[in-house]
């Protein structure tokens, strides 16, 4: 496995600074994440999790922290071994100010990892900062989370990481087809009504088929304004989807309906699915009423 075709990210930093939140953000960005991994095991993990096993993910993210004995030295050795394997991991270092970390620990009431060595919280925070200084100095990306909410942090990680790794499509799109006579899906964010298109139900040869069948799809898209509607819908979505991404949204449900949810909505939704996949979005489709229509 080479870095060029399978990105590897190592996320580390100060305890309480938000490493777990960052891992969750990267997981939402379609990375496979492993938290609490000893630094010494990073090369083995990269070897085990090959491209075929993670074919549906953007890359591999390994979360590590100071709880491991000799963490800094073990991380240095693992980075050297990974580079020898042709893998150049990007290191993301998460930090926050001492005042913010103190406040977070007071809120969560969890002990700092170094308090087990007999230190008080303030001393533990300072010692951790000193011990991890070499890692911070060589990190590809340093993120100070002191002033960020979870939603702010999501936007920052997506924006900053995109500048290093390239464009990341964070938005997951679910296309749902339905029949209006059965009701509009309650989870829909956008709803489009296709009942203005010619209905294959009234064509005897097409009635028993569904929008998954080529004759129906051809009829729906080529008769009336099917292709025109699809083109205008794509133009609209190509404008709208990046706006949702910029706001940190990671899920959007597009509902496409016709009378019974069997012919017109299915044909157009399948064409929309193919088009959006070409734009590298994570897209799924669900035909809720196709067998009822």
Swiss-Prot record:
Disulphide bonds in the chain: none
Keywords, in A-Z order: ATP-binding, GTP-binding, Nucleotide-binding
Family the entry assigns: Belongs to the RapZ-like family.
GO terms for MF: ATP binding; GTP binding
Cited HAMAP family: RapZ_like
Residues the record lists as binding GTP: 65-68
Organism, scientific name: Nitratidesulfovibrio vulgaris (strain DSM 19637 / Miyazaki F) (Desulfovibrio vulgaris)
Function statement: Displays ATPase and GTPase activities.
Gene3D superfamilies: P-loop containing nucleotide triphosphate hydrolases
Residues given in the record as ATP binding sites: 13-20
NCBIfam families: PRK05416.1
Name the UniProt record assigns to this protein: Nucleotide-binding protein DvMF_0424
InterPro entries named in the record: P-loop_NTPase, RapZ-like, RapZ-like_N, RapZ_C
């Amino acid at each position: 496995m080479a870095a060029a075709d399978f990105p590897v990210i190592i996320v580390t930093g100060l305890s309480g600074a938000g490493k777990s939140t960052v891992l969750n953000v990267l997981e939402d960005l379609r990375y496979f994440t492993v938290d609490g991994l000893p630094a010494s095991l990073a090369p083995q993990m990269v070897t085990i999790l090959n491209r075929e096993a993670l074919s549906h993910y953007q890359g591999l993210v390994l979360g590590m922290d100071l709880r491991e004995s000799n963490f800094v030295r073990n991380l240095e050795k693992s980075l050297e071994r990974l580079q020898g394997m042709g893998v150049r991991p990007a290191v993301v270092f998460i930090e926050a100010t001492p005042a913010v970390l103190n406040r977070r620990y007071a809120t969560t009431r969890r002990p700092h990892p170094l308090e087990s060595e007999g230190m008080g919280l303030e001393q533990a925070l300072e010692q951790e900062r000193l011990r991890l200084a070499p890692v911070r100095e060589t990190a590809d990306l340093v993120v100070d989370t002191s002033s960020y909410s979870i939603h702010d942090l999501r936007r920052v990680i997506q924006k900053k990481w995109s500048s290093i790794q390239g464009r990341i499509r964070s938005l997951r799109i679910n296309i749902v087809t339905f029949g209006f006579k059965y009701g509009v899906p309650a989870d829909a964010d956008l709803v489009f009504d296709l009942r203005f298109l010619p209905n294959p139900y009234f064509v005897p040869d097409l009635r028993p088929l569904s929008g998954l069948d080529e004759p129906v799809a051809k009829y729906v898209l080529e008769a009336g304004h099917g292709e025109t509607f699809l083109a205008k819908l794509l133009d609209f979505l190509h404008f709208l989807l990046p706006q949702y991404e910029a706001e940190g949204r990671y899920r959007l449900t597009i509902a496409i309906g016709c009378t019974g949810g069997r012919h017109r909505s299915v044909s157009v939704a399948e064409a929309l699915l193919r088009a959006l996949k070409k734009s590298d979005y994570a897209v799924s489709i669900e035909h809720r009423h196709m067998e009822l229509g």
